């Protein structure tokens, strides 16, 4: 009986490890970190074979299958949490101010961000549009700064596929 619980726990933990590595490896691949992704795939496959063999060798126990399935789901969550922490890549943050007369671009520049700004027309009049490129790990901090300066600002971010040119392009990993 103790051996059965040990196998269920092992399947659960090993599958969490497998799917966590799988999720991070997939994100590394999408971000262009091919060598790191390839290296992580080696560990991913070793762990996968171990987990799958434990389930297939003990297929008569439904708890093993459930441990595998639940470990898979938990592994996805853990992998996504890890990816959020390491926050690879860059984002483009677009801001539409509530009022045009704000000195938001200079205040954001003073914080070390590159800002391009221009006049925009909204439903209720003139607005200022800003475009800011920053590392993903700085996204929450940037949002906080913008909201402190203009709590009514409309903010949306997206992930650029390629970056070329600009005053800090040499800092951006190609």
Curated annotation (Swiss-Prot):
<dbReference type="GO" id="GO:0005886">
    <property type="term" value="C:plasma membrane"/>
</dbReference>
<feature type="transmembrane region" description="Helical">
    <location>
        <begin position="4"/>
        <end position="24"/>
    </location>
</feature>
<keyword id="KW-0812">Transmembrane</keyword>
<dbReference type="Pfam" id="PF10035">
    <property type="entry name" value="DUF2179"/>
</dbReference>
<keyword id="KW-1003">Cell membrane</keyword>
<dbReference type="Pfam" id="PF18955">
    <property type="entry name" value="DUF5698"/>
</dbReference>
<keyword id="KW-1133">Transmembrane helix</keyword>
<feature type="transmembrane region" description="Helical">
    <location>
        <begin position="62"/>
        <end position="82"/>
    </location>
</feature>
<dbReference type="InterPro" id="IPR022930">
    <property type="entry name" value="UPF0316"/>
</dbReference>
<feature type="transmembrane region" description="Helical">
    <location>
        <begin position="36"/>
        <end position="56"/>
    </location>
</feature>
<dbReference type="InterPro" id="IPR044035">
    <property type="entry name" value="DUF5698"/>
</dbReference>
<keyword id="KW-0472">Membrane</keyword>
<comment type="similarity">
    <text>Belongs to the UPF0316 family.</text>
</comment>
<dbReference type="InterPro" id="IPR019264">
    <property type="entry name" value="DUF2179"/>
</dbReference>
<protein>
    <recommendedName>
        <fullName>UPF0316 protein LMHCC_0787</fullName>
    </recommendedName>
</protein>
């Amino acid at each position: 009986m103790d051996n059965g619980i040990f196998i269920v726990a092992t399947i659960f933990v090993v599958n969490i490890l497998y799917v966590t590595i799988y999720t991070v490896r997939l994100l590394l691949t999408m971000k262009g970190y091919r060598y790191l992704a390839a290296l992580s795939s080696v560990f991913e496959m070793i762990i996968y074979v171990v987990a799958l063999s434990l389930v297939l060798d003990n297929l008569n126990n439904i708890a093993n299958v459930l441990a595998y399935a639940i470990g898979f789901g938990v592994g996805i969550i853990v992998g996504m949490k890890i990816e959020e922490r390491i926050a690879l890549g860059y984002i483009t943050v677009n801001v539409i101010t509530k009022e045009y007369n704000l000195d938001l671009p200079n205040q954001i520049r003073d914080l070390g961000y590159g800002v391009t700004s221009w006049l925009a027309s909204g439903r209720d009049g003139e607005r200022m549009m800003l475009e800011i490129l920053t590392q993903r790990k700085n996204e929450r901090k940037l949002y906080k700064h913008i909201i402190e300066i203009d709590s009514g600002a409309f903010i949306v971010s997206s992930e650029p596929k390629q970056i070329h040119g600009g005053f800090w392009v040499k800092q951006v990993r190609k």
